[in-house]
């Protein structure tokens, strides 16, 4: 029988499993990622987030449709049958009263509200005497119940025709008739039927007008070995657990249609990646970085904590951390002119930094240093996540495998070398992954907020049962990693090296 793997046809026996089909297609996937199978389409009826409010006026029946943006607004609308239009002005229409004694809410005064917004107001501060208000123009509203609102999406012209006394007869959900794609999660050992379409990954085409945000997405993928972990899922979007990133610019603000990928550029969720499942209007806090070209159905069935394979077009073009020979091969692969500055073997910086800008300019300038000037380190991100994030931020390694440290002081006779940190950020570092009995030579650590010199970064040059890499006692020390290669080079440094730049390159592997 014939099935399809990521769009490609594959012939397999009748009793074949998902695993058999993947092997026949030459496709391998990690055991911990989610896979789906698309079975076809079916006609369905489903409720939407909109409610139809029916009003009676004489022999005529009027209909208004409100898109509900909060569950409590649905509960308010359920109380409307029997209520009447109590007043109309050139600015607003009020229906009620309605009893909302069972709802939790807060009230504010003088809140600016757009036209044709449905809100709840509490003019007497008595929840049994609340009113459902529809605005006709932008206006400041008094005694508004915050976070209980909706939008009039149909029947706006009728709002202006209401004169008072019209009665709400009933409220009903708006039902959509749609064609629904039948998709289900599967395991590698599940059986298949003829025509099944196996989806193993999501393919994203990057937008050329969001190079910085796209690089953040590419870095997140690279650090997670091509997999993204689902953080949150709603009917509107699926969000991805991000790598930390700061100071994202506003770029390529556009419509958030189904399949659009965005990165939040501000706020507490800065850096979070979103894939939209339903259309939404543009918002300045979201940069559109790409569009799902294949595999959107997989994101319709994932759950929080799932991992999905993701590929991008184009893939990341990052030279930092490569040898000069590797950099030349990469430049040739993508038809990019390579300009090498400096004497050495290891690329420690590149300009432009962003993949999309490199491909746009078809030229990249890289800075190289001798390999023996680059210290290789392993970071313990799982054991000390906040401290490792701090280290990457200080060294500018949030999106690159190579960073820079400046020597603060080097005393071989004291058994440590200390590098400059960021005192302001360091004061926010809580104790985590403190040493227990001893600190071995090569251990990398930072001073936490328990000590005056919070934020200093250090490497232990010899074992100690008393002091950490920055010379602090164990309660003031957060262990963040170890030196894998180059400890001898650090031992050669002394006070004449104060202020010198030391390059560090992260290697990932088993401890």
Swiss-Prot record:
Q: Which domain of life is it from?
A: Archaea
Family annotation (Pfam families): PASTA
SUPFAM superfamilies from the UniProt entry: Cyclophilin-like, Penicillin-binding protein 2x (pbp-2x), c-terminal domain
Q: Which PROSITE patterns match?
A: PASTA
The record's similarity note reads: Belongs to the UPF0288 family.
This chain belongs to the protein called UPF0288 protein MK0796
Which species is this record about?
Answer: Methanopyrus kandleri (strain AV19 / DSM 6324 / JCM 9639 / NBRC 100938)
């Amino acid at each position: 029988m014939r099935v399809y793997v990521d769009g490609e046809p594959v012939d397999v026996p009748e009793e074949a499993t998902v695993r058999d089909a993947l092997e026949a297609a030459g496709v391998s996937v990690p055991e911990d990622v989610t896979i789906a199978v698309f079975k076809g389409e079916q006609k369905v009826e489903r409720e939407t987030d909109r409610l139809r409010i029916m009003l009676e006026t004489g022999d005529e029946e009027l209909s208004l449709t409100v898109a509900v943006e909060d569950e409590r607004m649905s509960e308010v609308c359920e109380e409307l049958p029997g209520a009447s239009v109590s007043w109309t002005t050139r600015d607003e229409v009020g229906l009620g009263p309605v009893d909302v004694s069972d709802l939790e809410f807060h009230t504010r005064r003088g809140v600016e509200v757009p036209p044709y917004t449905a809100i709840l107001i509490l003019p007497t501060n008595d929840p049994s005497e609340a009113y459902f208000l529809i605005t006709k123009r932008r206006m400041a509203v008094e005694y508004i119940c915050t976070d209980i609102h909706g939008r009039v999406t149909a029947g706006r012209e009728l709002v202006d025709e209401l004169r008072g006394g019209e009665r709400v007869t009933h409220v009903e959900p708006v039902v959509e008739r749609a064609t629904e794609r039948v998709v289900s999660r599967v395991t590698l050992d599940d059986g298949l039927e003829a025509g099944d379409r196996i989806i193993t990954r999501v393919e994203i085409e990057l937008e050329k007008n969001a190079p910085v945000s796209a690089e953040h997405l590419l870095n997140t993928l690279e650090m997670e070995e091509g997999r993204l972990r689902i953080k949150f899922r709603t009917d509107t979007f699926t969000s991805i657990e991000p790598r930390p990133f700061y100071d994202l610019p506003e770029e390529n603000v556009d419509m958030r249609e189904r399949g659009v990928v965005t990165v939040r550029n501000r706020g507490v969720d800065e850096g979070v990646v979103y894939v939209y499942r339903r259309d939404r209007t543009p918002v300045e806090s979201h940069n559109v970085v790409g569009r799902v070209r294949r595999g959107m159905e997989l994101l319709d069935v994932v759950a929080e904590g799932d991992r999905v394979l993701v590929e991008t077009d184009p893939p990341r073009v990052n030279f930092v951390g490569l040898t000069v020979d590797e950099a030349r091969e990469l430049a040739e692969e993508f038809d990019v002119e390579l300009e090498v500055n400096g004497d050495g073997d290891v690329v420690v910086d590149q300009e432009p930094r962003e993949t999309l800008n490199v491909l746009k300019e078809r030229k990249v300038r890289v800075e190289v240093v001798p390999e023996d000037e680059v210290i290789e380190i392993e970071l313990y991100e799982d054991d000390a996540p906040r401290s490792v994030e701090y280290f990457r931020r200080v060294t500018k390694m949030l999106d690159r495998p190579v960073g820079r440290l400046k020597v603060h002081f080097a005393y071989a006779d004291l058994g440590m070398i200390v590098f400059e940190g960021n005192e302001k950020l360091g004061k926010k570092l809580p104790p985590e992954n403190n040493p227990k009995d001893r600190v071995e030579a090569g251990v990398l650590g930072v001073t936490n907020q328990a000590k005056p010199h919070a934020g200093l970064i250090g490497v232990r040059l010899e074992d100690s049962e008393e002091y950490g890499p920055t010379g602090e006692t164990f309660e003031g020390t957060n262990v963040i990693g170890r030196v894998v290669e180059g400890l001898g080079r650090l031992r050669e440094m002394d006070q004449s090296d104060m202020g010198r730049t030391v390059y560090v390159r992260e290697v990932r592997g088993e401890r």
